[in-house]
Design a protein with these regions (language model features):
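C-terminal subdomains that position terminal phosphate/3'-OH groups for nucleotidyl transfer/ligation
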Residues: 1-160
């Protein structure tokens, strides 16, 4: 485990996982003179730990994003020490999710959307995220479906 994982486990143990651990992390950053890299890793692990506790309420796309994150292993290590049954449940779920790919290659990019006629805007990022979530959920299974879905999502953003 990383230094940030050890700090996160210590912080959760001392301040319980119900406390505002991000506020505590800010205080510890100052007191322990943590580097930006370690502090960001600590915050990420703490966030992932909180999300893991809500695992069964999360959608497939969110679960896959968590499982594919660089620091999921650290958050899982903490969960394993805290709640063995919960850890086993989530680990099995991740193994099942891996069968369909945790972080597959995106079917489309912003360049594809521009080529399809969408005007350059900040909305393109939101459209791409929605399309990728649909891809992770399994409701979009090809490049063509992704482009079609993207146009529909863009229209919804434009109309709202």
């Amino acid at each position: 485990s990383s230094y940030a994982t050890a700090l996160a486990a210590w912080m959760i143990d001392r301040h319980t996982s119900e406390a505002n651990v991000h506020e505590v992390a800010s205080q510890w950053r100052i007191q322990l003179l943590l580097s930006n890299r370690v502090y960001e890793e600590l915050r990420t692990i703490l966030s992932l730990h909180q999300e893991l506790s809500l695992w069964d309420t999360l959608g497939t796309a969110k679960q896959k994003r968590i499982a594919a994150s660089d620091h999921c292993i650290g958050a899982l290590a903490i969960m394993q020490a805290e709640d063995r049954a919960g850890f086993v449940h989530i680990k099995r779920a991740i193994t099942h999710l891996e069968q369909t790919g945790l972080a597959p290659e995106h079917f489309i990019s912003g360049h594809d959307l521009l080529e399809a006629g969408l005007p350059p805007s900040s909305t393109i990022g939101n459209v791409l995220e929605a399309v990728y979530d649909a891809q992770l959920e399994g409701s979009v299974t090809s490049r063509e479906e992704a482009l079609s879905f993207a146009m529909m999502v863009y229209q919804e953003f434009k109309d709202s």
